[in-house]
Amino acid sequence: MGLDPGDWQLQQLRSVSGLTGLERLTSATRAGAPLGRTVSEGPSKLSCVALTIGIVGLPNVGKSTLFNALTRATVLAANYPFATIEPNVGVVPLPDARLDKLAELFHSARVVPATVSFVDIAGIVRGASEGEGLGNQFLANIREADAICMVTRAFEDPDVVHVDGKVEPSGDIETISTELVLADMQTLEKAIPRLEKEVRGKKTEPVVLETAQAALKVLEEGTLLSAGAQAAGIDAEVLKTFQLMTTKPFIYVFNMDDAGMSDEARQAELRELVAPAEAIFLDAQFEAELVELEPEEAAEMLHDNGQEESGLDKLARVGFDTLGLQTYLTAGEKESRAWTIRKGATAPQAAGVIHTDFERGFIKAEIVSYDDLVQYGSVAEARAHGRVRMEGKDYVMADGDVVEFRFNV
């Protein structure tokens, strides 16, 4: 990243791990390299935070319509169960007005936002844990997701059949939650006898068996582990090793009609139903129409509908936060870009998201906060006012840090 031409150097990384045309991911000046000289690196691996949110829901709740809107993709959204057979993956940009401001300051040719990946997973019905419907395929696909977005129907439409014959959000949520709980119970019930033998043979630590038994007890009470594990005192790190579906964070999307979108009492009721998880209310059909418009027209349509932001933008933001992610920024004439890191990441770990060499040979990071940069208008002015700082290997990145990494390999 070159925040000021002449201050921070630019470089181009080419053909890294099969990725071609990857332009100037960041500026990086090797220790000892003359000022004004760019440094080119040989092939090595890129590191990235690639997390996905699985979109699940009973058939005909508007799940594929939502996915179509999220990705502007063409996904079959027919009015019959199992219209979605294979999981469809979409990468959705995370709205970030800071990038537009950086592009203005540095005359960037383009902006590259952070992204959230969504996977549209085939519909689930009662008995999925026993293989009913597309149960086995559903369970295999959802295990690969890092968080679960459960789409629930909260609108009435006689032309769109409901798989259970009635619209009842609490019932839909219970159906899907029950299938996930049952599937996780099966996983643990198979694992516990094996773990008991391994503990007796001193091949496995007792805490692993104890964690499995405690988790099974929570599930037997009909509670998702994401909601009940902490209260039960279950070791979170050990629990992760079982790769259970109900340990994943949940987001609940209620697909509503015009009446529902203006019914605050109904929304409060549904929000309480899924608390402490996040609840998002949107009209999937409206969102699908919105994404087909030019930005100015879309903004006007949102305003006329009494909304400050689209449901999709909110879903992307909530999804990003639910995954425990944040961004730092780079900027220059070629591009202004947001990079995705986990909350709590150190400066070397953040550098590794751009290129593994940056982490391996990390020396320091030159950082200015976005707010300070905008206030002073340039890196040079921010530096003159003492707002640009050098940080070392132990620095924990803050959201909105604008960064230049220095490294030596």
Regions found by a protein language model. Give the residues of each.
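C-terminal-of-GTPase-core extension/linker across diverse P-loop GTPases
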Residues: S44-V56, V61, F67, R194-A398, ...
